[in-house]
From Swiss-Prot:
Role, per record: NDH-1 shuttles electrons from NADH, via FMN and iron-sulfur (Fe-S) centers, to quinones in the respiratory chain. The immediate electron acceptor for the enzyme in this species is believed to be ubiquinone. Couples the redox reaction to proton translocation (for every two electrons transferred, four hydrogen ions are translocated across the cytoplasmic membrane), and thus conserves the redox energy in a proton gradient.
Catalytic activity: a quinone + NADH + 5 H(+)(in) = a quinol + NAD(+) + 4 H(+)(out)
Name used for this protein in its record: NADH-quinone oxidoreductase subunit I
Annotated [4Fe-4S] cluster 1 binding sites: 65, 68, 71, 114
Source organism of this protein record: Dinoroseobacter shibae (strain DSM 16493 / NCIMB 14021 / DFL 12)
Family: Belongs to the complex I 23 kDa subunit family.
EC number: 7.1.1.-
């Protein structure tokens, strides 16, 4: 019993715990840093990353959305509102496609439900706004997002194709 007390006292007076912690700190001090200097450096994004919403167009310029309203029905947050009208050729197209980004939970159900890959969640995660009204996306804003991110969205969908 007395031997154990001497060992504890020796460790205490020789600052054993202090030097053990100092050694651990030095070990990690010389390793490469794991943090990034955001916004100057950005980490890689997965092809499955779900960011800002976008509506896509076909290569001929026609919008892909066929107004089936599956995305509106499956949205658990009820963030999507769609109005549609039939066209002269018998097909339907949306007249109103709104997403309330303040309600959206970025679950990706809308993207999974869409039979024509019209609504997608793009790679953009930096869409801070100054007013709440800017977070209500209408059809034009969504189509603009789709045009801006089309190359990256198409690449991500192609990379994700084996898993769908």
């Amino acid at each position: 019993m007395a031997q154990m007390d001497y060992t504890r006292a020796a460790k205490y007076f020789l600052l054993f715990d202090f030097f053990a912690g100092f050694k651990l700190g030095l070990k990690y001090f010389f390793k490469p840093k794991a943090t990034l200097a955001y916004p100057h450096e950005k980490g890689p994004l997965s092809p499955r990353f779900r960011g800002e919403h976008a509506l896509r167009r076909y290569p001929n310029g026609e919008e892909r959305c066929i107004a089936c309203k599956l995305c509106e029905a499956i949205c658990p947050a009820q963030a999507i509102t769609i109005d549609a009208e039939p066209r002269d050729d018998g097909s339907r197209r949306t007249t109103r496609y709104d997403i309330d980004m303040t309600k959206c939970i970025y679950c990706g159900f809308c993207q999974e439900a869409c039979p024509v890959d019209a609504i997608v969640e793009g790679p953009n995660f930096e869409f801070a706004t100054e007013t709440r009204e800017e977070l209500f996306y209408d059809k034009e804003k969504l189509l603009d997002n789709g045009e801006r991110w089309e190359a990256e969205i198409a690449r991500n969908l192609e990379l994700d194709a084996p898993y769908r």
